[in-house]
Amino acid sequence: MSDNQQNLRLTARVGYEAHFSWSYLKPQYWGIWLGIFFLLLLAFVPFRLRDKLTGKLGIWIGHKAKKQRTRAQTNLQYCFPHWTEQQREQVIDKMFAVVAQVMFGIGEIAIRSKKHLQKRSEFIGLEHIEQAKAEGKNIILMVPHGWAIDASGIILHTQGMPMTSMYNPHRNPLVDWLWTITRQRFGGKMHARQNGIKPFLSHVRKGEMGYYLPDEDFGAEQSVFVDFFGTYKATLPGLNKMAKLSKAVVIPMFPRYNAETGKYEMEIHPAMNLSDDPEQSARAMNEEIESFVTPAPEQYVWILQLLRTRKDGEDLYD
């Protein structure tokens, strides 16, 4: 058993823990450290200047990143078949601008104070979380893949809301360590997906808010096919079971980054009324995603293989 596998098992109950190693100071990691130093410098650059420059850089990178752009084009073509090609390309350009603005702003999220991050954030519908907490209910936040998804999770901690989430450890151990300490800087726990869902649900039952990302494609065996925008998608159906096992309500939330105001926006909807029927539960989840994404499609991670599993076995991304 490798050291990494052993570490995953040992931390199954307490949460994933990445540890610093002196080997991270070897020359092979110097490029990463240089990049980190650059991001930390950007943390103190006024957001309007930083966002203006990085937004333009993101659009330029988006035209160079052929594989990612093609995936986004495919996803938008199926999800919004009524759009013109020009409309889809405009959304993709805006998306890559958001990508760069969020990524080059991560140093700010990693080291600036709670007070600073609170000023840089805005909650829309926070009363839905407050009501559930006041009623003594456990909470699972159903959070679609927006580009500001990591930043919003950290910002929630600044509001006294400890989070627990599942996480795929990064292949590069230094990057993995840096991401983990950033995500956990204000508390909460990350759980390695390799340990399954039980540790995650256990922490939700203990009162930590679950941070659940529902929209990846995990294949036909684990999914049901339900409508998704203008097409269909292999969708995980177990959200209602997760809620029952953790005795929690499921509250949808979508993170956005607004470059005009320089704020991370968290839009929160009322708790979902989930059906025991797997297909109805999965469709309700997709309806929430659609309601979040349709007004601001550039905020969604369209470069994922969202439609990888098709009924006829076709590979849309080949």
From Swiss-Prot:
Keywords: Acyltransferase, Cell inner membrane, Cell membrane, Lipopolysaccharide biosynthesis, Membrane, Transferase, Transmembrane, Transmembrane helix. Pathway: Glycolipid biosynthesis; KDO(2)-lipid A biosynthesis; KDO(2)-lipid A from CMP-3-deoxy-D-manno-octulosonate and lipid IV(A): step 4/4; Bacterial outer membrane biogenesis; lipopolysaccharide biosynthesis. It comes from the Bacteria. Its EC number is 2.3.1.243. It is a single-pass membrane protein. GO terms for molecular function: acyltransferase activity; acyltransferase activity, transferring groups other than amino-acyl groups. The chain crosses the membrane at residues 27-47. GO terms for biological process: glycolipid biosynthetic process; Kdo2-lipid A biosynthetic process; lipopolysaccharide biosynthetic process. InterPro entries: LipA_acyltrans, Lipid_A_MsbB. Its main location: membrane. It catalyses: an alpha-Kdo-(2->4)-alpha-Kdo-(2->6)-(acyl)-lipid IVA + a fatty acyl-[ACP] = an alpha-Kdo-(2->4)-alpha-Kdo-(2->6)-lipid A + holo-[ACP]. One of its GO terms (cellular component) is plasma membrane. A motif (HXXXXD motif) lies at residues 145-150. It is found in: Cell inner membrane. The keyword Transferase applies. It holds the Pfam family Lip_A_acyltrans. Catalyzes the transfer of an acyl chain from an acyl-[acyl-carrier-protein] (ACP) to a Kdo(2)-(acyl)-lipid IV(A) to form a Kdo(2)-lipid A. Belongs to the LpxL/LpxM/LpxP family. LpxM subfamily. This is Lipid A biosynthesis acyltransferase. It comes from Haemophilus influenzae (strain ATCC 51907 / DSM 11121 / KW20 / Rd).
